[in-house]
A protein has these predicted regions:
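Conserved anion-binding
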Residues: 1-55, 60-61
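C-terminal helical cap(s) of enzyme catalytic domains, especially alpha/beta-barrels
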Residues: 96-140
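Short Gly/Pro-enriched loop/turn and capping motifs at secondary-structure junctions
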Residues: 60-62, 90-93, 113-114
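Short, well-ordered secondary-structure micro-motifs
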Residues: 18-22, 65-67, 96-98, 119-120
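Charged helix-capping and loop-helix junction motifs
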Residues: 36-40, 66-75
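Catalytic cores of alpha/beta
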Residues: 71-109
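A cross-family glycoside hydrolase active-site/sugar-binding cleft signature
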Residues: 7-11, 57, 85-88, 108-110
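Short, hinge-like loop/turn segments at secondary-structure boundaries
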Residues: 2, 24-27, 72-74, 102-104, ...
């Protein structure tokens, strides 16, 4: 096993001051000991001890289909060479493409692919392979 087998997951909430803070229990509990620690500082610390990948979830956007937090992606992806997977709010394939342009290595999307129509009925659907290839710039 290598460093890629060690993944740390963060639940993140943006404060009124525009700072991204680590939260627990779906954003209901702010970690008191991390009150003043920006997410990027924590990533740098974890990089130094060998964490190989991160999963960062924007709690406020999770399940909303209102778009990924592109500011969060830009601010965290530039601070590490480790891959980061982003979750929370993916609204369509264009939104995922924007995330890649901002530095995301991968994007997690649940509701985008399961709930459809006016009644938000469960209907698992996937984009066409050609659409995926265009987002990934024909890397497949």
């Amino acid at each position: 096993f290598g460093v890629q087998s060690v993944i740390v997951s963060f639940d993140v909430v943006e404060t009124k001051q525009g700072e991204y803070c680590l939260y627990a229990r779906n954003g209901m509990l702010k970690r008191m000991y991390e009150k003043k620690v920006p997410v990027l500082s924590k990533i740098k610390l974890l990089d130094s001890i060998g964490v190989g990948e991160y999963l960062i979830t924007s709690v406020e956007r999770e399940g909303t289909l209102k778009g990924l937090d592109l500011n969060l992606i830009k601010s965290t992806s530039n601070g590490t060479s480790s891959p980061i997977i982003y979750a929370g709010g993916a609204s369509d394939l264009e939104d995922i493409s924007k995330a890649f342009s901002c530095g995301a290595h991968a994007v997690s999307a649940g509701r985008l692919f399961t709930l459809h129509g006016g009644f938000k009925a469960v209907l698992v659907s996937y984009p066409k392979r050609s659409d995926i290839k265009s987002i990934l710039n024909d890397k497949l």
